[in-house]
Amino acid sequence: MEYFDMRKMSVNLWRNAAGETREICTFPPAKRDFYWRASIASIAANGEFSLFPGMERIVTLLEGGEMFLESTDRFNHTLKPLQPFAFAADQVVKAKLTEGQMSMDFNIMTRLDVCKAKVRIAERTFTTFGSRGGVVFVINGAWQLGDKLLTTDQGACWFDGRHTLRLLQPQGKLLFSEINWLAGHSPDQVQ
């Protein structure tokens, strides 16, 4: 289990100066050729998402105004807060900010031939399904994960096991992504 606080994470500026990324975790850890990766991006200007051939991207708007996503011949989609949207990361996708507002989003990318991610928003205590990887990010409220207290802009990632996240207040929201490995693949094969 690895814990993080978004306010203390290192920031990587984009080459086009349209935003920045905070990498949460990758599997395998510290590898450029990853099977899955979770990150938080701040987008300051209209522009294109980076291309990642062979990957699927699920993007969830955390803060800011709605964002319009356009892929030339595949889709037009308005990204609304806390509504995950998946698309192939090897296609050109343009993001247009609403009214020029800066936005912040959660991204999880998985290699299409190896694993699949599912992203949900939780508003009550729950236990993960025992997947072989996952990430949680606290949107608001206070949550207990094992002996660790997680609050707004904090989270954790893991590479194995079942975990219970207990909401400690009457209300709270948590973004939760779980990784499932496709038949014939296992994280044990790459560690």
From Swiss-Prot:
Designated gene of the protein: ves
Protein name, entry field: Protein Ves
Family assignment from sequence similarity: Belongs to the Ves family.
InterPro entries, per the entry: RmlC-like_jellyroll, RmlC_Cupin_sf, Uncharacterised_HutD/Ves, Uncharacterised_Ves
Species for this entry: Escherichia coli (strain ATCC 8739 / DSM 1576 / NBRC 3972 / NCIMB 8545 / WDCM 00012 / Crooks)
Family matches, as HAMAP family: Ves
Coiled-coil regions listed: none
CDD domains the UniProt entry points to: cupin_HutD_N
Pfam families: HutD (PF05962)
